[in-house]
A protein has these predicted regions:
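Extracellular carbohydrate recognition and processing domains
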Residues: 697-733
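Catalytic domains of carbohydrate-active enzymes that cleave complex glycans
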Residues: 444-668, 672-674, 682-684, 688
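Acidic, contiguous N-terminal accessory segments
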Residues: 9, 15-104, 152-159
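Structured mid-domain segments that build the active-site/substrate or prosthetic-cofactor binding neighborhood
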Residues: 247-254, 262, 267, 367-470, ...
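Feature activates predominantly on carbohydrate-active enzymes
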Residues: 47-50, 54, 93-307, 314-321, ...
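Beta-strand acidic-aromatic groove motif in beta-rich domains, primarily in extracellular
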Residues: 681-700
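Short beta-strand-plus-loop segments that form exposed binding edges in beta-rich domains
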Residues: 739-749
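Substrate-binding cleft/loops of secretory-pathway carbohydrate-active enzymes
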Residues: 326-354, 400-404, 432-441
Length: 764
């Protein structure tokens, strides 16, 4: 027995020591031939070309391409289900269980098989080979890692099968959502994928797209004048502007069904199978008796929506059984209705816009996360087709420190547990120079494929690729932000957070800045210097906006060393902003203008402002806009002091300009009087031309409201006039707002409002 054990041990040792299969070796002739089926799909042929291209970049060896119509080479990399694959494996039907995107990597020396169906499986398998054994990585359109190698080899015992967790994996960050080849290298699959990349089953109609389609189905400009009953009844009025549809009106159902069927007839032959029927991107659900009764019984305003969409889907299914009608569980329709279950061909897209993103949905203590957990669970148990529209940026300020890394993987695991099969993540970002957004999107792509991939292993690789010898410094920075205390129960980290609001403590920001300065110094003059420099953007941006860039009415001297440090940060930001590809600072024009003006103003200063000023005058660039930000704009105005003003168009309905008091350096115990220089377009004497007040954005309540009596608003006066508001003692979250007035009729446009400037006067 002892002799047998020794022999077996020796045999296992020999097997374990089997030499790797060499695919290409620098300085030698090609070791392998890449073989595809003679009738290979365009995607399989592209997979072969990608493997050939990257192996040549890595080893300077160009492997020949062949098909299985030719004799099997002595050493082959077989892509897809070639006629030789089953024989080499000793198994038939080797790819059936892999689906369109799954793959199996199998070494059978001297051959290597990359198995997959005729879809993207072989292509994804090629990228896995290149990442795993070649050290390749594609982080952004401008930063990829393709190491030069002496030899490219794979283990002789390689045998691994992978299938994606989600059938649709999409995000819209630079490259991932706008360059198909790049997205495919990260195992994403986009609606735009053409034949070369395996096409897609998930294309949406170009008119009835993913979201907010009511106004396209029943345009108010076409129907409201003759049929106001088609539109939502709110507070006793049918609304033309910012309206939804009356979903219990049979004519609305007929018109929508006809339009959906017309769109399907036009786009179905092009391979489109998804059509959106969903509310517009605001509130104002219909409150008519019929709609109110359906929603009352369903205990949710999604009751009328799902019942309505079910009726359309039922009609569609008769002719197009493979078509899906998608609608939104978003805002007021997120709560699942009681007793109304979506049909088989209805897809419900769940949205996470209200969440706290400092932690994953299951982990966060924020009240909205608890509600989302409940709602997702009920939708999941309904058995309907589920997709998710997730959010992974701070849209209020793209470069604000917003450490949502603790939510990325956990949320995807949560979505999988609820039965979600399709995920789209909105990751609008600050431009290609934003290293941290690139890293965030790379992580998302990895976890959309497999949310169980180890975070530390991924980040280790990512930080070493980006920062080289400074990787440990960046780990220290990353852990500092992740572990820093935050009161997310009271102040959740939402996706429209306030750069001036409660968040990371100033001591954390100072320490973070010092760590990244050390990292940049460590790699100065190396290939990693640019990434280390760009990695400082979020800390610099947050410190500048919360610190020295704030106009001051304080009685206290500024800390000179701190001021100089923040001034240097502003100069670093301006250096990046002035590049051709620059930085996109915010989701809307007003925010971009305000942030840009303050950063540039600080960068040009030589000394801080002297304390003790009694009056602070701010031009229009210091104001930001609230939703809908697209209608808030800057205009030439000869009546304004500097010839420019903010225009709030009356037809916009809800457009408002804001000045966050935390964007100013004010004393905590100070008393101040805000004044505004405003004019409005001609209006009747019974029309309120504008409103103003103070609103707390953290606690979501009105602090002061300055009406006509309080501020002596003159009706119908077109010239600028200063209006003095009440005394305020601003607290965290307090914000001065100036908004449109009231025409007395919800369907009549309010007067246009021009805002020239704001003045803050210190009285104590």
């Amino acid at each position: 027995m002892r002799v047998l054990a020794v022999v077996l041990a020796a045999a296992f040792s020999v097997a374990a020591a089997a030499p790797p299969v060499v695919l290409a070796e620098r300085g030698n002739p090609p070791a392998c031939t890449i073989v595809t089926r003679a009738d290979a799909s365009a995607c399989e042929r592209y997979a072969a070309q990608e493997l050939q291209r990257f192996l040549k970049r890595q080893t300077n060896v160009e492997l020949p391409l062949a098909t299985d119509a030719e004799p099997l080479p002595d050493h082959a990399i077989l892509l897809g289900a070639t006629r030789y694959s089953a024989g080499i494996l000793g198994a038939t039907n080797a790819v059936a269980a892999l689906g369109d995107e799954g793959f199996r990597l199998k070494a059978v020396p001297p051959h290597v098989l990359v198995l997959g169906g005729s879809g993207r499986g072989p292509l994804y398998g090629v990228y896995e080979l290149l990442e795993r054994f070649g050290g390749c990585a594609w982080y952004s359109l401008r930063f990829e890692v393709v190491p030069e190698l002496k030899a490219f080899s794979v283990p002789a015992d390689l045998d691994e099968t992978q299938r994606p967790t989600f059938e649709l994996r999409s995000e819209n960050w630079n490259g991932h959502g706008r360059a198909d080849d790049f997205a495919a290298r990260n195992k994403l699959n986009l609606e735009s994928f053409g034949e070369k990349l395996g096409g897609t089953r998930f294309r949406f109609d170009p008119v009835l797209g993913k979201c907010h389609t009511f106004a396209r189905l029943v345009p108010p400009e076409k129907w409201f004048d003759t049929h106001p009953e088609y539109f939502s009844l709110v507070a006793g009025h049918r609304l033309r502007n910012h309206s939804q549809l009356c979903l219990t009106n049979p004519d609305v159902l007929r018109i929508c069904t006809e339009e959906v069927m017309r769109r399907i007839a036009e786009s179905y032959p092009k391979g489109i199978r998804y059509y959106g029927v969903s509310p517009n991107d605001w509130q104002n659900a219909c409150e008519c008796p019929a709609c109110a009764e359906v929603d009352r019984r369903a205990k949710s305003r999604a009751g009328t929506l799902i019942a309505f969409v079910n009726r359309i889907a039922e009609e569609v299914e008769k002719t197009y059984p493979d078509v899906f009608i998608q609608t939104l569980a978003y805002s007021y329709t997120r709560r699942p209705p009681v007793g109304i279950v979506p049909r088989r061909n209805v897809q419900v897209c769940l949205c996470t816009i209200e969440c706290d993103f400092s932690k994953s949905i299951p982990e966060s203590r924020a009240i909205e996360n608890r509600r989302v957990r409940h709602d997702f669970g009920v939708w999941g148990r309904s058995g309907c087709s589920l997709s998710v529209w997730d959010y992974a940026s701070d849209f209020g300020a793209y470069h604000h420190i917003w450490p949502n890394y603790g939510a990325l993987r956990g949320n995807l695991e949560f979505f999988e547990q609820q039965g979600v099969r399709q995920v789209f993540t909105l990751v609008n970002g600050g431009g290609p120079n934003e290293v941290w957004s690139n890293i965030r999107c790379w992580l998302l792509a990895k976890w959309m494929w497999n949310p169980r991939l180890d975070e530390k292993a991924l980040l280790d690789r990512c930080f070493k690729d980006h920062f080289g010898p400074a990787a440990d410094d960046v780990w220290e920075y990353f852990n500092l932000l992740r572990d820093a205390p935050r009161d997310t129960k009271r102040f959740p980290m939402g996706c429209f957070s306030n750069v001036y609001g409660p968040g990371l403590d100033e001591t954390v920001l100072v320490r973070a800045s010092a760590i990244l300065a050390r990292a940049e110094a460590r790699v100065k003059g190396t290939q990693y210097a640019e990434n280390a420099h760009l990695a400082r953007i979020p800390v610099d941006f947050t410190r500048v906006l919360r610190g020295a860039a704030r106009p001051s009415l304080s009685r206290k001297d500024r800390d000179l060393a701190k001021w100089l440090d923040e001034r240097d940060a502003a100069r670093r930001l301006v250096g990046i902003m002035d590049r051709p590809d620059g930085l996109s600072l915010c989701d809307d024009l007003a925010g971009r203008t305000a942030f840009t003006a303050r950063i540039r103003a600080l960068a040009t200063k030589e000394t801080p402002e002297k304390p003790g000023r009694l009056r602070l005058t701010l031009d229009e660039t210091h104001l930001t806009g609230s939703y809908p930000a697209t209608v808030f704009r800057y205009v030439e105005d000869p009546q304004a002091r500097d010839g420019k003003a903010i225009l709030l168009p009356g037809k916009a309905g809800a457009c408002t300009a804001w000045l966050d008091f935390q964007s100013l350096d004010l004393d905590a115990d100070g008393l101040y009087i805000p004044r505004i220089r405003v004019r409005a377009s001609p209006c009747g004497r019974d029309v309120l031309p504008f409103r103003a007040g103070v609103y707390n954005r953290i606690f979501r309540r009105v602090v002061n409201s300055f009406g006509p009596d309080a501020i002596d608003i003159q009706m119908g006066v077109e010239k600028y006039r200063w209006y003095t508001l009440g005394v305020v003692s601003p607290r965290m979250g307090d914000t001065l707002w100036i908004g449109l007035g009231d025409a007395g009729d919800p369907n009549a446009a309010a007067p246009d409002v021009w805002i020239d400037r704001v003045e803050i006067v210190r009285i104590q």
